[in-house]
C-alpha cells in the first residue's frame, strides 16, 4: 500500500539495474514486496493461494519459504544478467517468487490439472512447459511491460530448489523432470 502512495518509497526499493550495479543489491529482494497496483498484487497472491499448499504439503513450511525467497533471488539474478546493460531497467512484483512456487508445485505434482485461460483443463507439466516457452518469447520480444525474465528465473529457482530438497523426484518423476527442464535448457542454448 505504501508503495502506491509514496513514489519516493517506491523508487527507493524497486528493482533498478543502475542502482543495483551501484551497490544496492537489497533491491533484488525489496522489489518483490512492491506491486504496480492492486490487480498486480491480487493476481500474484491468488496464484500463491492455489499453489503454496501443494509445496507446503510436500516440502513443509520452511522449505516453502526457501523456495519462495530463493525463486525471488533467482528471478532477480536472471533479470540482472539479461538486462545488465540497460541501466534504466525497472521492475517490481513477487512474480518471480510466485512462479517459483508454481513450478515447484508442478514438479511435485505434475499430474494435477490446471485450467488454461481458467477454462481448458491441461496437465500441470504441459502448462509449465508452455508457460516457460511463452516467457522465452516475451523475453526475446520485449514488447510488453511484463517481467518475463523474472518469471523465468523464478521458475528455474523453484525447479532447482525443489530438486535439491527432494532429489528422489529425479527417480519418481524422471520424465517430468526432463520435460520441465526443456524450456530451461532451451533458453540457455538461445543465449
Positions of predicted regions on the chain:
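A detector for small-residue-rich transmembrane helices and their helix-helix packing motifs
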Residues: 1-191
